[in-house]
Amino acid sequence: MRRMSSVGLIHIAAHGNERTGEITLSPNPGWSSKFPQRNDYVLKMSDVQAANLRARLVVLSCCHSGRGRVFKGEGVVGIARAFLAAGARSVLVALWTIDDKATMVFMKSFYQHLKEGKTASAAIHQSMKSLRESEEFSKSWYWAPFQLIGDDVKIEFEADDDVKE
């Protein structure tokens, strides 16, 4: 979490909890017990809210990362909202289980469009369109789970940043 406080773009590819949207990370190698405890590998809302983020965009490439508890008058309160509360301007989430291969294709396209100067929403739109028009990923199950929450941001990349094939 300390490292996240100083970057403009955060990308987390991990597992998301179907019910809560909490994110399961690799356990910290410095855990104190013989077996990792839940706190060693689950990224909770309270962990995120305690951070002081300056990220313009957080990408949660995790199943169910748009999930949370629904509160009357508040809407969905989950990990994505915690990132916004901690200072992120925008969060890209998945609303349901995402296919690994389709997500890889989506993310490559998404980052390429961001690098070309498109806004996050335009990059999402173009990436969804590309999947939708493909033979392999034309079903909505593959291209429709991604949702942007927050501001429609642009990301400035360094000249030597590259989207790997």
State where each predicted segment sits.
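Catalytic cores of enzymes
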Residues: 1-165
